[in-house]
């Protein structure tokens, strides 16, 4: 990627990051690829902390906080397909909106948004489980609730499913259907709550409380989506634990990358 004025950008970014002063315009625009998208960040940004690169996000950890830069990359089924101009800014804005709107339902890791394409968050120990909530009998992957139902299975992640449901039909109630976070190159597995407890990944009491809170988050998301002519079909929540032991929502919430939406 061709970097333009990356060193000047780094200095301004670092000052804004250290002083925690919001930045009025995107400093990352100086790192755009010729096509107008942010596919990577300058090497100079490594001064912001230990670096980890995800499929879409660049992470810099320093002490008890993390700087997350949301790139314009788009991925599906663990493959980066390309970039979409300003996708990162849209994802970041949506995540911020939902974090702030739902903090009373489940605390989250957000500290501030120093740039349209980045956020400062509290460093957490991730819980190795994806908390997937589903409201409809749908999906395209082999591990989806619809594929299981199509194969004749009438129980999914410990939830009994009635006979006679059709594809894309609304489920009798919203369901928490956890999945494992498989190593890179492997598929996640949909599992039951009992399995998570048996594996020692989380206690039964914690899981019951988190199920209640995740379902509340999803219901709030569905209500707000309905007001705008949309259906929140299903979504994925990721959770982490602070050094204090408190469990908080991390990563993102109700974005198009983590959720399925339909037009109502």
Where are these regions (language model features)?
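Short hydrophobic transmembrane-like helices used for membrane targeting/insertion
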Residues: 1-4, 21
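Active-site loop/lid in soluble adenylation, ligation, and acyl-transfer enzymes
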Residues: 22-182
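Short, positively charged and aromatic/hydrophobic N-terminal segments
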Residues: 17-19
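Catalytic activation segment of kinase domains across protein kinase-like and atypical kinase folds
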Residues: 238-264
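ATP-dependent phospho-/nucleotidyl transfer catalytic cores
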Residues: 120-122, 138-231, 242, 259-264
